[in-house]
Amino acid sequence: MLAKVKLPNHVTVGSFKVQLVRIPHEIAYESSDYQGSFVSKPPLKIYLDEEIIDMGGMDAVNLVLHELCHLGFYQYGLKDKEEEHIVNSYGNFLTELLMRSELKGWLLWQIKNA
């Protein structure tokens, strides 16, 4: 098995750089019963339940992608947009995320080792 790839400290998609912040499981659930949270005011941050991230696999990937989709929604200004605009924007966003961002290595490791 290859060495485990750590979740990056930040992800850059286009001109948007978002910090990935791991928080203790107890804090995530005590503060508002969430596993992750996107903060859309600068500096952009995503808070992630470290227990889920440490477990890795499908749940960790789902959590990270879910929160990053909030970034895409914010980045492309998708509130009140038509379906085709939303789908096209997410296609562009996910392509950038999967092909060029700092998250690529972590995602590939998770997929190969799930």
Per-segment meaning from a language model:
Residues M1-M58, Q75-A114:
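Metalloprotease/metallohydrolase-associated module, dominated by Zn2+-dependent proteases
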